[in-house]
Each structure stands twice: as C-alpha cells, then as structure tokens.
Amino acid sequence: MAWYLRRVRAMEAEKRTTPTMTLLRWMVGLLSPYKLEVVLLIILSAAYIGARTLTPYVGKMIVDEGIIAGDRGKMLYFTLVYVGLTLLSWLTRMFRTYFSGRLNSELLYVMRSRAYEHLCRLDLAYISRQQAGRIISLITNDVSAVGNVVTSENIDLMINMLTIVGSVYIMSKMHVWLTLAALSVLPLLVGVTLVFARKTRQVYKTTREKVSLLTSSVEQSVYGARVSQAFTERRKIDYRRFSRISRESVRANLKAAMVTALINPSLSTIRAIATAIIIFYGGLLVTRNELTVGSLIAFYNYTGLFYQPIIMVATFYNVLQSALASAERVYLFLKEKPGIEDSPEAEDREILDGEIVLENVHFSYDGSKVFEGLNLKIRSKSTTALVGHTGAGKTTIANLILRLYDPQKGRVLIDGVDIRKYTIKSLRRQVSLIPQEPVLFQGTVLDNIRIGNPEATRENIEKTIDELGLKEIIESLPDGLETKVKPGGENLSVGQRQIISFLRTMVRNPKIIVIDEAMSSVDPFTEHKLQEAILRLARRRTCIVIAHRPTTVRVADEIIVLKHGKVVERGSHSMLIARQGEYARLYSQLLRQ
C-alpha cells in the first residue's frame, strides 16, 4: 500500500506543466558547449540543401536545353552537372550523418553523466519517494529522446525548412501560378497537423509513464524472485500487477499508434492531391505553350522534394511533443534541489572525541511524527546499543547522525558542533554506516573492500583484517582476497557479505560507526566474530549498534531503549534487567524468539 501511495504521489508531482518555451530554450541551450560542431553541421547541411534543391532544376535543363533542343553538348554538360550535384548531395549527407551521430553520442554521454551525478547528490528523502524504474527510465529513455531531438532531429528540421524555402523560390521563378496551385493544399496540411498535434504530447507522456512503471514492476520481481518463488500467493500478486501494468502500457501504445496511423496516411493523401493538381494544371499549361515539358517534370520532382519536408516538419511536431514530455521529466529532475547541502558555515572538520548529542530534535516522515523534542547523548569511544520495537526511531537516529536527513527542528551535535557546520564530505568520511543488507559489486573481495578507501594498499587491508580478528573468515574464501564476487555477492553467504561490508567501512578508519541491524541475518559464528571486532573498535571509536539479538545488545557499554520516539530507559544490560522495565520485557521477547 505504501509503495502504491508513493507511486501516486510521484505521478501527481509529474503532472506539473512546464511552459513549452522554457523547455525549448533549455533544450537548445544544451548545444552551447558544441558551437564548432554545430557550425560544421550547418555548413554541411547548407551544401546538401543547395545540391538537393538544384538537382530538379538541372533535370529541367537537360530536357529543355538538351533533349528537346537537340543540343548534345548542353545535354552532356547538364548531365555532368546533375551527376556532380548528386555526388555532392551524397557526400555531404554522409558526413553530416556521421558528425550528427557523433555530436548526439557526446551529448547523450554528458547528459547522462550530469543526470547520474545529480542523482548522487539528491537526498534520501527524494530517492525514497521515487521508483527505481522511473529513475532508470529517465536516465536512459528520456535522455535519449531529448538528445535525439536536440541533435539529429533538430538538424533535420533545419534542412527541411530550408529545402522548403529553396524549392518554393525556384518553383516561383519557373511559374508563379503553378506554384500557388501546388501550395493550395497547404492550409489542409496545416489543419490536419494541428488537429492531431493537440493530443500527441499527453499520449506520448502517458506511454513513457507506463514504460517506467513496467520497468519498476519487472525490477521488483527480479529483486524479489526468491520471495515470490517461496510464496506462490506473492507470485500470483506480482503476476497480476505486472499484467495490469502491461495491459495499461499496451493501451497507451495503441493510442499512440492510432495517432501515428492516422497522421501518416492523411499527409500522404494530401501530397497525392498536390501531385495530381500539378500534373493536371501543368499539363494544361504545356498544351498552351505556357510551360515547358522540362519545367513540368521539374515541378513534379519538386513536389516530392517540397512536400516530403513539409510532411517531416509536421511529423517533427509530433516527435517534438514526445520529446517535450521527456524533456519535462529531465528538466524537473535536474531542477530538483537536494534537501541536504553544505551550509554557508560548513567547513572540513575533524572529529576528535566522537560524542554525539541530539538536542530537542523534531522529525517526521511525510507528516508522520517520529520525534518530538528528543534529547539524547551518546558517549564517545564506547559502544551504545539502540533497542526498541519497529518504528521506535532507531534507524532514524542513525540517518540523522549521518545527515541523510535533517531534523525539522533541533540540532545534532558531534563534539559540541552542529553537524551542519561540517561539510557533508568530511562528515561522512568520518561517520560510516554498516547497513543490514550489504551491497557488493562485481569484482574481487579486495576490490569491494577497497571501495571504502581507494588509496588503501593490500598490506593496510590485510593489517586491518588481522587486527579485527577476521583473518580466518577471509582465508576461508576460495581465493582469499582475490575471490571473484558476482553482482550482488550472490556467490557468498550472508555472513561473508557482511564481513566484507564491515571491512569496507573499517578501511576508511572512521571516528564513528553506525551498525544498523548488520547482524540480524548472520550465523552465530559470524556474529561472534563481528562482536569481537566491535569490542576492539570501541576502545578508540564511537560505536552505535542497532540490533535485536540478545547477544549483540548485551555486549554494549550502554543500552538506550526507545519507545514511540522517546528515550524510556538507558543503562547497562545488568542494570536494566534488574530494573524489570521496558528493556527487560524486550529482552525477554528477544530470548523467546
């Protein structure tokens, strides 16, 4: 249900309408770093347009001045000119296509890199509101749609517009009235285009929304394959949801296909009408000696040269509507301000002691209150366990300390300094999180550990492993540190993945470590090894452990019990057990589990 509500909120937010001119200015502005490439493409396009528009006129000269006049010399001359123009048209089109494709590839690379970097800067609050499939679709499909229109489609539009102007000019020089007759169907062409254009933007926007929802559904099914296969009911629910979204996607695509199916035949019919007018009226002019045969042939050729660009210009409007839907999503995404940024007073600071204080903290998720005036102090260079039922605020405290979120009111202090006065980079370099579900990447175990500190040498990593007493576990792997890791670490046990995640954090040499349910799924042997490592760490670092297991909680120097966002008890394990309060009840429940 929560997933569905997040989806609805995301779709409602995307219904915001950005002015078309704003989007067009932004799209054109994307080309500003590529001025030389654009100039080269304009020169190639101009040469292509000149060769293309002159070719039918030279064909006229071959017929009138060569064949009909019986002048072999002129016939040979104009034929050679015709071949030269055709060759020039072919060469300029080839080079234009190549350079346009190269510009398109470069622009897509820059846009995707920019979008990805922006995604990495956005805060957890924004990312948690979005679907992974929607973001993936934006960075891949939407960026491609925008890039294609800005480069190749935009250049094609310019060529088509200039081809229309050049063709009309030459046609009018040959015969004004026949030119006007050829243009007589233009109002009908414009009218048909405008009728269909009204619906296209929303239709294409809907299709892209459905594609992103379909991507999210597949992604969720892949990630949850183990659960779906274990619970046949869940598999049925996933299948029904996928089928529903897939049917909606089919319906949206059918609507888009219907628009396209109606536009292209309509435009082709109008072109056929224009051709018929030229042949009939032009034929009458030829019989009255008001037009040469060569000119009639040229007019016929110009019809194809003239109306094809008009059809493409009209179609471009529909392509543009599709691209504008994508552009709006990318534009709004890049305009999204990170909720967590460095404040003007932020400095690179060193954490010396590691004492943490939450002072009168108020915090809520989407209007649901978690803390109202929470005051909490965590001693430095000690291990503090946070316990409480689900929803008590344990993980929220971890997120606030890491500054993944900011409190709506109150402060979080480290060594007496508001963490907003630390730069985000310096804070997270010294405060590290070990999550419940470790994320491993394809490569070796050594590569995955080195993510925590790319500068760490193998000798330093081996020393850290030895100091933490984890050498036995690493050596038990098939190739030790050189063991290959499959995507997600699927070839390793949960315990092995968690050990690697733990070591990744430790090579950073953080001053504060937050361990969020990291031992909830590991085996007893791995848990024991991690507990020993934590005890070694606590001598010189501040450790915060969020856990449910009794053995994990018991080794903490101090235990803080949370209930409904408030601290209800704190003290050592033995002290709290003797008090027979909230902790004793929780501990008893944990033992029974």
State what each model feature region is.
Residues 258, 305-333:
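Cytosolic ends of transmembrane helices, especially the final helix of ABC transmembrane type-1 domains
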